[in-house]
């Protein structure tokens, strides 16, 4: 049963974050014809962002012994049992989300659409609510160790925020 929940969590994340939201951004943007340089920029940012997210997921599974899919305090897949402070979690406390944002910023550059930007801003706002709720739970789960980690590691943007 645990394997089914793991797979479900990964599939939901793939469908929502990698396919559905970018598809919505693209559909709302209308008839877009970016040049080669813009497409290359998108490809580089998409690869970097998705790569960071995948690294974070693998690290979470191997070190944290859990899964990333925990939506607004509803456990979709098994939660992590170990606090992760190394690997991609040394970069920021939410490297998986940072990777998604890098991917979406590449998409925004490619689409050059205010409608896609509105989707991004709405997604960003919802995800920040999720992150704040998740951080409260992590403080409960890991106590002082998590509080110390928060003091040393930025929430989302390395060295800034």
Give names to the regions the model predicted.
Residues 91-98:
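Histidine-centered phosphotransfer motif of kinases
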């Amino acid at each position: 049963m645990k394997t089914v929940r793991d797979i479900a969590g990964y599939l939901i994340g793939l469908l929502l974050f990698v396919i559905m939201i970018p598809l919505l951004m693209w559909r709302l943007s209308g008839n877009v014809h970016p040049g080669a340089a813009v497409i290359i920029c998108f490809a580089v940012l998409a690869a970097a962002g998705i790569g960071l997210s995948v690294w974070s997921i693998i690290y979470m599974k191997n070190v944290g012994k859990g899964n990333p899919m925990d939506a607004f305090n509803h456990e979709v897949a098994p939660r992590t049992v170990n606090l992760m402070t190394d690997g991609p979690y040394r970069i920021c406390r939410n490297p998986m989300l940072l990777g998604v944002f890098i991917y979406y910023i590449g998409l925004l550059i490619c689409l050059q659409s205010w409608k896609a930007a509105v989707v991004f801003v709405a997604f960003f706002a919802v995800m920040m609510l999720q992150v704040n709720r998740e951080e409260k739970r992590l403080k409960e789960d890991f106590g002082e160790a998590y509080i110390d980690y928060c003091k040393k590691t930025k929430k989302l943007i390395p060295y800034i925020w």
